[in-house]
């Protein structure tokens, strides 16, 4: 079990439509003013990180979207402690250019910039931008090379790389990003559920993000990533888990909210999203790409967030969160239906219970049920 207190991140709603593809009311907004207020509220309610989404075209319930790196910088400048993770596609960036942007953002925010490397997502976006859409495992091979080039740009005086996808020839980045003990450069996050994703995370990433999973699925993923890191001779990346959180005063209220979200799902958008993302992972060597076993209900929340089971009373959710920590989860990436009020509710009602359970685990044997 990680010794450090759990970290919490939230999905930034910088695209329209909220975090569920449903016609249920979502008291949220994709605009900057709303998100600036949300970022301040989040850092005052126990959140350590925010993750901006990367979308380039309308579709699947998201008709409007702000670009992730520029939006991340705006949120960094509006906050004092919150770390903001910008999602990027290797196929649409040169790592040296992103390294330059990241170094500047890191200085402007006093060391709070981070990046999430997204290997896949939507083929239609790459096609519309005139860029090649690689097969699944090739996308991860490119992403690994991207991360190596990014890290070299941030840490070496004259970075050199002669890769299959990128080249650096004596690239000298000045100023370097701000380095501190335990953080020599901006943190590098990476997502993915496939075998290729897990192997890559063990070799090069600082953090590994998983889609929503049950306890058994998370334990399997953590073991795979740690095994990959061991073979690479490096410390394993920290583990982040996605979850859509529905905390209510009673279990019945929480379950009814979930039932209504799914009952009012935008069927056409959910099925279109499912077809698009399954195509992205279908070409894996072992057929274990992201979303390959996701049900319709899972897909209503883009990243299988219902599967993590953070639905119920504050007490039940806190127990569930700490049960995952005992498996090795270091961070939860959370989404909400009504962001402002639910982030505040989380900070006031759920987080104190999590900290109490963590303290109890440090002083005695674990006895909290997982409610799997």
Question: Where does each model-flagged region fall?
Answer:
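An alpha-helical appendage that flanks or caps ligand/catalytic pockets
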Residues: 1-14, 40, 129, 136-182, ...
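Alpha-helix-loop-beta-strand connector modules within alpha/beta enzyme cores
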Residues: 62-85, 142-146, 346-362
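Short, acidic/polar
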Residues: 29-42, 98-101, 191-200, 258, ...
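Conserved, mostly hydrophobic/aromatic
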Residues: 8, 42, 46, 75, ...
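Hydrophobic faces of well-ordered beta-strands that scaffold small-molecule active sites
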Residues: 6-10, 50-52, 83-88, 113-117, ...
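Active-site mouth loops of central-metabolism enzymes
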Residues: 18-33, 87-96, 132, 137, ...
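Acidic (Asp/Glu)-rich catalytic clusters
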Residues: 2-3, 40-44, 73-81, 102, ...
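N-terminal beta1-alpha1-beta2 module of alpha/beta enzyme domains
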Residues: 1-78, 176, 180-186, 368
